Amino acid sequence: MKAAVDLKPTLTIIKTEKVDIDLFPSPDMECADVPLLTPSSKEMMSQALKATFSGFAKEQQRLGIPKDPQQWTETHVRDWVMWAVNEFSLKGVDFQKFCMNGAALCALGKECFLELRPDFVGDILWEHLEILQKEEAKPYPANGVNAAYPESRYTSDYFISYGIEHAQCVPPSEFSEPSFITESYQTLHPISSEELLSLKYENDYPSVILRDPVQTDSLQTDYFTIKQEVVTPDNMCMGRASRGKLGGQDSFESIESYDSCDRLTQSWSSQSSFQSLQRVPSYDSFDSEDYPAALPNHKPKGTFKDYVRDRADMNKDKPVIPAAALAGYTGSGPIQLWQFLLELLTDKSCQSFISWTGDGWEFKLSDPDEVARRWGKRKNKPKMNYEKLSRGLRYYYDKNIIHKTAGKRYVYRFVCDLQSLLGYTPEELHAMLDVKPDADE
């Protein structure tokens, strides 16, 4: 009987917690006075806000704002923020930080998004953005084509701030067969920066990649169709159709048979291609919201060096090549492993666990576990380790993007044309980072 009496005050406290008092600021309240959200209060806020967010539908209809945030222009993003500011009496919102289109906004990821806004404001805006994206998501039809998603989506060239990203792309749907990869740098074909900038995403769900007819005609290519079979971990190709395990590995999926496999898929030229740069596996989970829709060819003006030269938020305290800035420049959306490695390699504070060797684009993982830990933190994959990270690196071998240096442990080399893309020679980067050639060299 006593236990029942003790339980009543606890239940009463939970039931009488006021959402409008604890969670919503009054018009004259400064953002600094708003208490930090707890997991329980965030859940309550989520439930309370859903009803309020429904009012945005009228604003969308009035201003012609697309239902899918991925299709928003910079003007649509600004209108959305303005609506939220007026609806919730938000303060401390810097509209200049929203100078991007919807695709870039959605690609930021939650933590990066929240870093740009005051605590409470960021949670409200992110909650609404997630709801809008989930409402727009449609189940992928069995016959293969998702009409709700266009084949092309443009991304912003303003995507400059770097932070944690939750999205990750997947590798191409199928190789024709495994091939032997040489580790000799001298035997590689050159890879042009134009190939990197002609990247396409795999669409949500089953992977069917099509080139535009004009683009196809301009390349000497060989085509192949998707094989209806389960892919082994060796070739690191993953589908989007189902979640599963292969050979005891909890980080790979199987490819389901498709009804329509007679369509031409990803083309491969006689030389190595950067097409694969957008399709590094995310290893531990494949949630549908982690996959952006297909992007068009994106060819920015100038080099990455030109792109960031006058950016105010590029300073000595940040890496020379922030991964998110590089992702925005190339139009890749979510940060990829090769971009993340370049970020670490151009950050002086990371030289204790990853650094250039001083020999061109060669680099060494002095502490591979720390590199893997940071990659897992960036991608919100707590189970990430070097074994899983190395699978991603091995995937790059086949595309002549990164190769393992023979005879050296944890030593790799970028073998693609980074100089044309970045606008930096390796020697320039070494000088900026005070890199000294390894004594072993």
Swiss-Prot record:
Keyword Transcription regulation: yes
Annotated spans, Helix HI-1: 304-312
Regulation of activity: Autoinhibited by a module composed of four alpha helices (HI-1, HI-2, H4, and H5) that flank the DNA-binding ETS domain, reducing the affinity for DNA.
Annotated region of DNA binding: 335-415
SMART domains tied to this protein: ETS, SAM_PNT
Positions of region (Activation domain): 130-243
Pfam families: Ets, Ets1_N_flank, SAM_PNT
Region Helix HI-2: start-end pairs: 323-330
GO molecular function: DNA-binding transcription factor activity; sequence-specific DNA binding
Gene3D superfamilies: Transcription Factor, Ets-1, Winged helix-like DNA-binding domain superfamily/Winged helix DNA-binding domain
Region Helix H4: start-end pairs: 418-422
GO cellular component: cytoplasm; nucleus
Domain PNT: 51-136
Natural source organism: Gallus gallus
Protein's cellular compartments: Nucleus; Cytoplasm
Assembly behavior: Binds DNA as a homodimer; homodimerization is required for transcription activation.
BP GO annotations: positive regulation of endothelial cell migration; regulation of angiogenesis; regulation of transcription by RNA polymerase II
Stretch list, region Helix H5: 426-432
Similarity comment: Belongs to the ETS family.
Chief location: nucleus
Lineage of the organism: Eukaryota, Metazoa, Chordata, Craniata, Vertebrata
Protein known as: Transforming protein p54/c-ets-1
Its job: Transcription factor. Directly controls the expression of cytokine and chemokine genes in a wide variety of different cellular contexts.
Key word Transcription regulation present: yes
